[in-house]
């Protein structure tokens, strides 16, 4: 029962942090110090990635009409715009496949530590504040996904590669990149959500494949633990996405920047104290 409760808490953390630009990894590094599943490391590593499937499904459910090119309620123009949106998303994910996929395991092996995570939290927190201050009196060049050029989509996809560095935040890197290029906050957030679908779905499937291909099995309650994490992640991510979309209608991302800086300092302070 305790392991199920831990899965609920980890699902909540994943659901809240996956689409807010605050780094799910940064939070899991801290949470892992206090709430660690009493399971083999191989299962825990797989669990931490695969619970993202719940967050992905939250995007699919929330945006099902917008993302469905076969909807009978859409006009021919709207169906064409939906197909074009998917083309932009697929093009944007290419840099992660070409560059990110080969580097992923190396990054996890060499950079997955509290110091890298905390530095990334702080650096990107500062960047959010600086860029928002710079853009506060500027009109966005792209205020609709329909007007977003393919070259801008692929540039945003290039920013996603930065999220290979633990603590960066996939949504943080893509939203920051999109705003820097000149999109509105709303377009930046939505495109980041859509870009997550192939990116995170692919990452989750790859992790599952590696888990089972290397002899992993779901023993005891592990299947239930994984299912609970995915379901909780879905419910919380759904609420988190709705919150963010409502928030950025009237506010900017500076609060998230300050939050990242504070969290980064807390991570450094906590592990520095542990070392002594």
Curated annotation (Swiss-Prot):
Key words of the record: Antibiotic resistance, Cell membrane, Cell shape, Cell wall biogenesis/degradation, Hydrolase, Membrane, Peptidoglycan synthesis, Transmembrane, Transmembrane helix
Similarity field: Belongs to the UppP family.
Additional remark text: Bacitracin is thought to be involved in the inhibition of peptidoglycan synthesis by sequestering undecaprenyl diphosphate, thereby reducing the pool of lipid carrier available.
Function: Catalyzes the dephosphorylation of undecaprenyl diphosphate (UPP). Confers resistance to bacitracin.
Protein name, per record: Undecaprenyl-diphosphatase
Assigned GO CC terms: plasma membrane
Gene Ontology molecular function: any one: undecaprenyl-diphosphatase activity
Membrane-crossing residue ranges in chain numbering: 2-22, 43-63, 83-103, 111-131, 147-167, 186-206, 224-244, 255-275
One GO process term, biological-process aspect: peptidoglycan biosynthetic process
Assigned EC number: 3.6.1.27
Native source species: Limosilactobacillus fermentum (strain NBRC 3956 / LMG 18251)
Annotated membrane topology: Multi-pass membrane protein
Annotated catalysed reactions: di-trans,octa-cis-undecaprenyl diphosphate + H2O = di-trans,octa-cis-undecaprenyl phosphate + phosphate + H(+)
Top-rank taxon: Bacteria
Position of the signal peptide: none
